[in-house]
Amino acid sequence: MIQMQTMLDVADNSGARKLCCIKVLGGSKRKYAGLGDIIICSVKEALPNSRVKKGDVVRAVIVRTAKEVPRPDGSAIRFDKNSAVVVNQAGEPIGTRIFGPVARELRAQRYMKIVSLAPEVL
């Protein structure tokens, strides 16, 4: 569950290291975002000579959340940290690699490029 002002780790090699959520997309009254949702973020930490700079406003797809997400079979998935992948306007990742596992829920929301780049899908 991600809301405004939530700090997220970045799970790709776009150059950003920390993001701060500034808007949850999907309606003016929407308060929370979950796995596979797109949010608008501000880059709080970035590597030098990277594609995204500190202070840039970017879109990101949430790939891991600390809040458990129930699944249809009765199980639930949760991760240690909140993480996101920086994407462009078309929803394609800016980076060329993804670090760490991603949730299976991304496949249902048609983020096939992110799922295929991930080393593990849980």
Curated annotation (Swiss-Prot):
GO terms for molecular function: large ribosomal subunit rRNA binding; structural constituent of ribosome. GO terms for cellular component: cytosolic large ribosomal subunit. The keyword Lipid biosynthesis does not apply. The keyword rRNA-binding applies. CDD domains: Ribosomal_uL14. It comes from the Bacteria. Binds to 23S rRNA. Forms part of two intersubunit bridges in the 70S ribosome. Part of the 50S ribosomal subunit. Forms a cluster with proteins L3 and L19. In the 70S ribosome, L14 and L19 interact and together make contacts with the 16S rRNA in bridges B5 and B8. Belongs to the universal ribosomal protein uL14 family. HAMAP family: Ribosomal_uL14. This is Large ribosomal subunit protein uL14.
